[in-house]
Amino acid sequence: MQTHHDLPVSGVSAGEIASEGYDLDALLNQHFAGRVVRKDLTKQLKEGANVPVYVLEYLLGMYCASDDDDVVEQGLQNVKRILADNYVRPDEAEKVKSLIRERGSYKIIDKVSVKLNQKKDVYEAQLSNLGIKDALVPSQMVKDNEKLLTGGIWCMITVNYFFEEGQKTSPFSLMTLKPIQMPNMDMEEVFDARKHFNRDQWIDVLLRSVGMEPANIEQRTKWHLITRMIPFVENNYNVCELGPRGTGKSHVYKECSPNSLLVSGGQTTVANLFYNMASRQIGLVGMWDVVAFDEVAGITFKDKDGVQIMKDYMASGSFSRGRDSIEGKASMVFVGNINQSVETLVKTSHLLAPFPAAMIDTAFFDRFHAYIPGWEIPKMRPEFFTNRYGLITDYLAEYMREMRKRSFSDAIDKFFKLGNNLNQRDVIAVRRTVSGLLKLMHPDGAYSKEDVRVCLTYAMEVRRRVKEQLKKLGGLEFFDVNFSYIDNETLEEFFVSVPEQGGSELIPAGMPKPGVVHLVTQAESGMTGLYRFETQMTAGNGKHSVSGLGSNTSAKEAIRVGFDYFKGNLNRVSAAAKFSDHEYHLHVVELHNTGPSTATSLAALIALCSILLAKPVQEQMVVLGSMTLGGVINPVQDLAASLQLAFDSGAKRVLLPMSSAMDIPTVPAELFTKFQVSFYSDPVDAVYKALGVN
């Protein structure tokens, strides 16, 4: 068996890549003549005009798609002139309206959205920068460009002005409308050109096309950036990316394609997103290829069934409203910020914590096909943005859109079988991710076994990251996370792990200090969590105090029970020990932030005996079970989940009550055999076993 989770690092140094950059420019200009643009021109223009990148590059592609400096310079002047004369700046809207009135018609670039005014039975356009809300639109124009009705598109339009006394409609009307998008797309051109690039070069081409400079980016980071593009080439692909601020998480969805919509956090409605029952119109998921939610922490649905419908849609690509079952093709992307460090989150909580409470539900997260580790992507600095040639953004967007019609999900079966830990949803997720990566990297379908292996390894990692969080949220139901694949030729099995697999150091190796005890138990909230008791003993007269529980009296009482039992039964543990010569302070640490627990009496007893006798608890041991003041042992609630949590936290030994022995069949054998188990029948027996005294 092997562990296989390293992405390939191409054997090319940064210096070579820098010189290769110019070869890549030459290759691009040779095989994509007229389809490439220098990205530094985009940056220059972007700083002056608040226009999406694909609009700028559409214009640059018309005038500057050449490697002749004179042509580029002349083209750049043309584009600047068009932006100066025809692009409407919101503060100059009144001036442009006046121009339209004086000249009778005028050509402008603006974002146009259309709605039907049923009272007047006309389509009315809203021009966002010009500030006109009711310009008349011919119905044929709307039929030809349906996206005008949902969210709107950037267009080059000719606006007419005609006014006569007593007219009920607006004097403004649209004469011509040309969407700023590629008119047609020849996929054979892409397939033929792709043959002239190797895989690493093609990854660099894709990254340059969205404005990144691959020479300054590590190989693993490149894969994360490419994965951000999968929703553009795969239908109904669900992905989330949480990470620090400033890593460009939403950039691709906002700037790089006219087919994606970025919904900024905040309220959204079922009618807007899925289906408006009043107007019988499908919402955003029917009109856009990608719907991305920015700032997931702020998402709220006005409707109670919003999350429910979203679950339905994410699982099947369809949902029902009223009597209709409606299908959509849009991929769902969830983007958000992580405020703590990843190490802290992995140890004490789960990596989906930034989602709003209404969405923290295993059924919802199980529908994610991938979780991109945003914390592995560096914060964006100027050197990460390219000044070289890349594909024109809307050409790239159209190529990605065409790839949605194809499927490469059977690529795995030619070379590999998936391991037995993957359930049906895992298999679908891994297939979708592999298919998406291959569509981006090998659109011509000419991929080798090694290409598929690399994509498969990455796909398993990003799905396993989802599964690991589900395991923390849902316990044993999601126990099978050891993803693997089997080579069809050699029948060798390779396991794939997640780099940030943390938490296993919560219970450190080595002998603990006397008075330190770890226990796994259910908190009052119902969540299973890990707790550490730390005890201090000073000279005194037998008093005890407890800290770390705040004002929770029932949790303090549970520890009081342990202390009183300790006081009354110490002679059964040790005849020589003197209880009343010391004062005891017990501090409770919640390692999983699950809240206080009332099942802590037994662990408190063990901690107090340990410090008084100056004998540590056995190495990496976890205490399970609790007791009453009369010494009756209570069995463990949800034994399987408790053992899973103990294992994930790094425990090697378990102290288990005899009364829980009947629950052992509920624990998977491969989990139970990971521990050295000591059974106890009463509290004093538990103390002896914990301290390793026979």
Swiss-Prot record:
<dbReference type="InterPro" id="IPR014061">
    <property type="entry name" value="BrxL-like"/>
</dbReference>
<keyword id="KW-0051">Antiviral defense</keyword>
<dbReference type="GO" id="GO:0004252">
    <property type="term" value="F:serine-type endopeptidase activity"/>
</dbReference>
<comment type="similarity">
    <text>Belongs to the BrxL family.</text>
</comment>
<dbReference type="GO" id="GO:0005524">
    <property type="term" value="F:ATP binding"/>
</dbReference>
<dbReference type="InterPro" id="IPR013473">
    <property type="entry name" value="BrxL"/>
</dbReference>
<dbReference type="Pfam" id="PF20442">
    <property type="entry name" value="BrxL_N"/>
</dbReference>
<dbReference type="InterPro" id="IPR008269">
    <property type="entry name" value="Lon_proteolytic"/>
</dbReference>
<dbReference type="Pfam" id="PF05362">
    <property type="entry name" value="Lon_C"/>
</dbReference>
<dbReference type="InterPro" id="IPR027065">
    <property type="entry name" value="Lon_Prtase"/>
</dbReference>
<keyword id="KW-0378">Hydrolase</keyword>
<dbReference type="GO" id="GO:0004176">
    <property type="term" value="F:ATP-dependent peptidase activity"/>
</dbReference>
<dbReference type="InterPro" id="IPR046838">
    <property type="entry name" value="BrxL_N"/>
</dbReference>
<dbReference type="InterPro" id="IPR014721">
    <property type="entry name" value="Ribsml_uS5_D2-typ_fold_subgr"/>
</dbReference>
<dbReference type="GO" id="GO:0006508">
    <property type="term" value="P:proteolysis"/>
</dbReference>
<protein>
    <recommendedName>
        <fullName>Lon-like protease BrxL</fullName>
    </recommendedName>
</protein>
<dbReference type="Pfam" id="PF13337">
    <property type="entry name" value="BrxL_ATPase"/>
</dbReference>
<dbReference type="InterPro" id="IPR027417">
    <property type="entry name" value="P-loop_NTPase"/>
</dbReference>
<keyword id="KW-0645">Protease</keyword>
<dbReference type="GO" id="GO:0051607">
    <property type="term" value="P:defense response to virus"/>
</dbReference>
<dbReference type="InterPro" id="IPR020568">
    <property type="entry name" value="Ribosomal_Su5_D2-typ_SF"/>
</dbReference>
<dbReference type="GO" id="GO:0030163">
    <property type="term" value="P:protein catabolic process"/>
</dbReference>
<comment type="function">
    <text>BREX systems (bacteriophage exclusion) provide immunity against bacteriophage. Part of a type 1 BREX system which protects against dsDNA phage. This system allows phage adsorption but prevents phage DNA replication, without degradation of the phage DNA. Methylation of bacterial DNA by PglX guides self/non-self discrimination.</text>
</comment>
